Amino acid sequence: MQPEEQQIPDQEAQNLNETLGSGETGDGLSFSAEKYPYYQMLTENQQSVYRQIYANAQDLTEKFAPEKTVSASDVKTAFEAVIGDHPEMFWLETGYSSKYLANGQCVEIDLKYNSTADDLESAKQRFDAAAQNLITGAASLDSNYEKEKYVHDALASAVTYDLTADMNQSAYSALVNGKSVCA
């Protein structure tokens, strides 16, 4: 997950500042420690850019300016946390681009989306149906261990390791397409 980073001159950053909005800010979003452990490990500024990345990815916004002053390193850390916490956001590629100033301040984040973003509602339905099949199969089992083992074994038998698979590091690739690699 190596971002494409580009250092830009101050004048170009000023032009970006005048034309590029912050997109969705993610204000009001909350992420519990139990379900979203990576979010909890972030600094306050990193959490802010995490919420902004999450909200813009939900809205399929491609380019936006960070709402708070953050470094390129902070953006990378926040982006990796979003990817780790949200495998259900299968339409978001595991790489992004950013522009930053000589002092390291990030001034633009460019998210990348895979082909499922073109018909996201249908893709979500296929993903949810595949996930529901696993949940239904595990539901009658007694212990959490048995349920986890059922899901593990079902995935191991249904998914083929394929370096050339489309979206090969996503939950969608594994659940819907049946081909993936370890992320």
Q: What are the residue ranges of the model-derived segments?
A:
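Secondary-structure boundary elements
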Residues: D119-A174
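N-terminal accessory/pre-domain segments preceding catalytic cores
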Residues: M1-D142
